[in-house]
Amino acid sequence: MMRMLKKIAGWSRKKKIIVIICVVLTLVLGATGAVFGYAASKVNKIQKIEVKKETLKESITEEVEHKSGYLNVAVFGLDSRDGSLDKGSRSDTIMIVSLNQETYEVKMVSVYRDTFMRLKDGSYNKANAAYSYFGPDGGVALLNENMDMNIEKYVSVNFNALVDVIDAVGGMDLELTDAEVVHMNNYCVETSEVTGKSYKKIEPEVGGSYHLNGVQAVSYARIRYTDGGDAQRTVRQRIVLLNIMQKLQQMDLTTINKIADSVFPQIATNFSFTEILNYAKDFQKYRVGETLGFPNVRYSKMLSGVGSTEIADTLASNVAEVHQFLFGDTDYQVSGTVKGIDDEINDALSSGKYEEADETEKEDEKSEDKTSEETNHTETNIKVTEDGNTGTDSGGTSEDSSTGSLTVTEPQQPDTETPPDYYEEDYYYGDD
């Protein structure tokens, strides 16, 4: 990160600062895309979707004394088929990015998308349902209410943007296991359909070092069905992120300009251009620190009508850990709001309202997964070229993992005005 913040020959100080803050707020912090800009004419291409003032007022708990000197930003990586970055788009990546304005350290909390949490309307569901049903309002409210945060700003990036950026920087070299090769090939079918970009299928499907283009790298970052599940997916996302970071140091202004034209329309935020400049004055000093998964202490449970979920061992203890991690608060006392949500989750689970799916339901889900994986493994109507991508710089590592099941179904747009009572695992875009 520090090397990235060094001077880029020929760029003015203002241009470099704006580039840095845009990168920090999107690429570095979202693991889902990148923004590069150096003039208002470029930044104006970004979608402006505001968060309602009443949402902020209602979701930020007044009893919590939030520490000053931090800029906390919500970052969402979206799987949007129509380019819309408002409600109706599922957030596969959910992160809290905290910028310490005194020590210049950037810390990140990755919220597992399957985490069972309370939505802004009081219902309970998976974390990624919040953005799908309510847009940025719902995503920001989710983090504030469930985690005692005071987030007012967000950045959302479409997965298509990440494909474009990876291709623009020449792809990346990654070490893949046997299982990752199989699942990446499967995900490439859908990713190629959605983005309209081609890829080269890896054959034979054995582990090793491979050069991946944008479609392949994004598909790799989406893999879930290996050991570690959703948590391991966040590791893969960070691997892709760090590889792109290494590539950024070699980019010239012409390439940056092309990426901005392609990527900016695939980004939404409520940051103004003026705010970016105001926050940018010290960004040459910022460095990326550690990342924490949330909930860190958790267990998995199959809930009837909801699907596979991650449930905090206790929400209160996990929230306290987040505040210690981000703000160094070793004696943090969670708010009454978090305690209430914790109690409601425990009551709902113990009451049988979300009684665990019976064996028949589980077998049906496994059967659907298997059928979908076999179907997607055939590249029907997909253009698969022999030329993968150009560029051989940088590398990365991944964790060992083993085989699992995969399902990617045809998308069905949910009714975003009247959301269903539950968010089934494959209700929207499939269980990926």
Regions found by a protein language model. Name each.
Residues 76, 82, 114, 141-152, ...:
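Structured segments of extracytoplasmic/periplasmic soluble domains
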Residues 82-85, 125-133, 148-153, 207, ...:
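Second-shell loop/turn segments in exported
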